[in-house]
Amino acid sequence: MDALSQAISSGISVPYKNNSSSLVPSHGLTSLILRKSRSPVNPSSRSRVSVRASEIQHSKTSASSIDLSDPDWKLKYEKDFEQRFSIPHITDVLPDAEAIRSTFCLKMRSPTEDFVGGYPSDEEWHGYINNNDRVLLKVISYSSPTSAGAECLDHDCSWVEQWIHRAGPREKIYFRPEEVKAAIITCGGLCPGLNDVIRHIVITLEIYGVKNIVGIPFGYRGFSDKDLTEMPLSRKVVQNIHLSGGSLLGVSRGGPSVSEIVDSMEERGINMLFVLGGNGTHAGANAIHNECRKRKIKVAVVGVPKTIDNDILHMDKTFGFDTAVEEAQRAINSAYIEAHSAYHGIGVVKLMGRNSGFIAMQASLASGQVDICLIPEVPFNLHGPNGVLKHLKYLIETKGSAVICVAEGAGQNFLEKTNAKDASGNAVLGDFGVYIQQETKKYFKEISTPIDVKYIDPTYMIRAVRANASDGILCTVLGQNAVHGAFAGYSGITVGIINTHYAYLPITEVIAYPKSVDPNSRMWHRCLTSTGQPDFI
């Protein structure tokens, strides 16, 4: 594993707890949550069991020190939450950094060569965001811990407000546009909408007045590989890139050490870095941010979460997810037609989702043609009286065909572990889609029932397409707000949509662990209602 991957993967411990119903510390709520946990199929295979938010205590939280018998515990909780979700600012280490009037004004949508009076401004314009504006993180007030998906701070489910910083342009900025050299990188795998985000970061930077904008090719690797040169970017260069999938800048995993990256940034004069990537990439961005603070250099590092798995904490969704679901349901529809047209036809579709089954769940719901949906978060047996194969036999006998949708991370306990890692330090998964296809054929052969199995794996097809309209809008706003955050002097932050509003969060709060499907949630229950599948345990 390279030095950057080591920085990404270090420091986060995820203990496993198996409490049938207990109060346990939660990073997600920074306090105590009452949550019923399911027991795994095989207690010895803990590595396969997804860890819920209620089973994790983040190193920064002081939740365990909050005494619920204290009459002021709510106030203490709110202060603890506010402190943890405060967003880093360059004045934290550079208190003398000068704030100037913003150069961003919507009455001047296109950049001009000369600004009258120095910079465009309109004292009567009410388009700026106040630094004290907040967005509510949790919007449901649960009346009972038994409510579906309930996240309660105590046995009474007391309501406590959790506020995070609203995203958008500020009236005061901390960078002069003529002194800015902004760089954009895209890391990890492809995702619909990458070019859309790049495009609007560039356009918004130009509206602020920045003329020195570059793209770093192939992720963090572009900072150290001497054969790779930075790409000059402008509105003209990026004007139509959103019409294609992929990334104009290219992607890769891993990269050089954090110190090498910051050395390269200093040599190039980069003082704004926009990082598009998932949890691992954001961990790297946070390490870069910390190194810049350590050196006391004026640099804004801003992330834009990128993962079609939709496994970023706290956010409604990440860009590319809607497009991925839309493309995934096309594969499911094809599997249905193949299965329905064959005698005893069975369609098996494997979709992306290493640790979370959001794509499989949502695509199953969207298609309405899935009979069995298997995700990493929900334990299941293949064999036995309550197993998947027994139910599949029932479907063939009663319907004549069936469609199975599996997330790539599901069923890993049935496969042999290799302990192999990819360049980002992620475990290389076994192919459960192929495995369940083989087991299905074997099972029906043993019971002398002829079947016709069709296996579809659209993994790379669903992520290489251009963004749909919904994701296009999301990417546009995320790109704009990333630039607003950087000019406002924030660093070590990421931008996302939370309860339909856009907000800034400290990177540390979104990389603690991957978000996953809650088996007690209404959305998973809706999926079960759609498929009609039983519990396979």
Swiss-Prot record:
Compositional bias annotation for Low complexity: 39-54
Gene3D superfamilies assigned: 3.40.50.450
Alphabetized Pfam families for the sequence: PFK
Active-site positions on this chain: D309
Source taxon at top rank: Eukaryota
Pathway connected to this protein: Carbohydrate degradation; glycolysis; D-glyceraldehyde 3-phosphate and glycerone phosphate from D-glucose: step 3/4
Annotated site residues (Important for substrate specificity) in this chain: G280
InterPro entries: ATP_PFK (IPR022953), PFKA (IPR050929), Phosphofructokinase_dom (IPR000023), PKF_sf (IPR035966), PyroP-dep_PFK_TP0108 (IPR012004)
Catalytic reactions of this protein: beta-D-fructose 6-phosphate + ATP = beta-D-fructose 1,6-bisphosphate + ADP + H(+)
Tissues where this protein is expressed: Expressed in roots, leaves, stems and flowers.
Top enzyme class: transferase
GO biological process: fructose 6-phosphate metabolic process; glycolytic process
Chief subcellular location: plastid
Location(s) in or outside the cell: Plastid, Chloroplast
Binding residues for ATP: G189, R253, G254, G278, N279, G280, T281
Residues reported to bind Mg(2+): N279
Activity regulation summary: Allosterically activated by AMP.
Transit peptide: 1-52
One GO term describing the cellular component: chloroplast
EC numbers: 2.7.1.11
Cofactor: Mg(2+)
Alphabetical list of PANTHER family matching this protein: ATP-DEPENDENT 6-PHOSPHOFRUCTOKINASE 1
Membership in a protein family: Belongs to the phosphofructokinase type A (PFKA) family. PPi-dependent PFK group II subfamily. Atypical ATP-dependent clade 'X' sub-subfamily.
Complexes and interactors: Homotetramer.
Name the UniProt record assigns to this protein: ATP-dependent 6-phosphofructokinase 5, chloroplastic
